[in-house]
Each structure stands twice: as structure tokens, then as C-alpha cells.
Amino acid sequence: MIRNSKGFTLIELLIVVAIIGIIAAIAVPGLLRARMSGNEASAIGSLRAVNSSQLNYNVNCANNSGNAPSLANLVTPPLGGGQPFLSPDLDDTLGPPVKSGFTVTYTGTNPVVSALATCNGAAAGTVLADYLAVADPTAWGTSGNRHFGTSEAQTIFQEMTNAPITAISAAGVPVPATATPIK
């Protein structure tokens, strides 16, 4: 009796599945590292956007008297019309925004008491002399391996350990002191 052997044998199929598994095992860690690098680049971009919008806000909305009291104030357009100073995806009205695996938080200090009301409705005296914006990974080691922070001095710092940046002094020294500026 003649057998008509069309198709693949079980051994051939197992070899193909094993090869695909080996290729996947090699590729997946690289893809995860690339995703983490992309998340970190997005966090740096978000902090640069905060710095840029604060400068624009100070000059064009706060009469050179200081910085916005919140990210929500930066995403509010001027009362006379126009574009907001910051993208709405960083609005902190409902809590700290999460963007690309990083939580962006903003705190301000030292209200400028003599400041007038701003062009987008911030009350007189709510403009701030100092601010700290930080971007922390939502899952350390998964969404990012670095913490980032910036202040009114416009320098962005990175911390390579799992220790968030909690302050940047007027002299430009970050806390923790092991944080380094990004070039």
C-alpha cells in the first residue's frame, strides 16, 4: 500500500515552535527596554514642556511676577482667547496626570503677594516664585528606571536609584543629592 505523505511531521512542527520561542525570548527584553526608554524620553519632554510653559506664562500672563499656581492653571487659556500655555494631557485638576508610565506632580511655593491677577483668571497673590515638577515612574523597573525633576531654574535632574526627587534648592542642588542634571 502506498502512503501519500503530505504535510509536516510532528517533529518538524516542534522544531519550528522551538525556534520561534527562542527568537521571542531574545527579542522581548529589547522591546521592553525600548519601551522604557521611550517612557523616560516622554517624561523628560513633559518636564521641558512645563518649564517652557512656565516661562511663557510668566512673561505673557503674569506680568513677569512669577509662575502658575498649578498645572491646571497652565492648561487654562487666557480669558481674552488664545491657546493654553500647556497641553491638556498634563492637567492636574483631577489629580496628578499619568503620561507614558510616569506620574507628573507639581508643587509651588512662595506666593508672590504683590502679584496682580493673571490673564487667565488666577487670583491676585496666587502667582508663585518657586515650583517643583517631578515625573516618577508608575512602576519602578517596568515603566522607567529613573526619576526626574525640575524647578524654576529650568534644569532637569535625573535620579538613577528608586528615590524620587523631592526638592531642588535655590542654589540648584537637588534632593537627593545624587541626582544629576540631564545634558
Task: List where the protein language model places each region.
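Functionally critical, cavity-lining and gating residues within the transmembrane helices
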Residues: 25, 40, 56
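Extracellular/periplasmic head regions of type IV pilus-like filament subunits
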Residues: 49-146, 150-153, 160, 175-183
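A short acidic/small-residue loop/turn micro-motif
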Residues: 163-166
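N-terminal single-pass transmembrane signal-anchor helix
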Residues: 3-31
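Aliphatic-rich helix starts adjacent to a transmembrane/signal segment
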Residues: 30-47
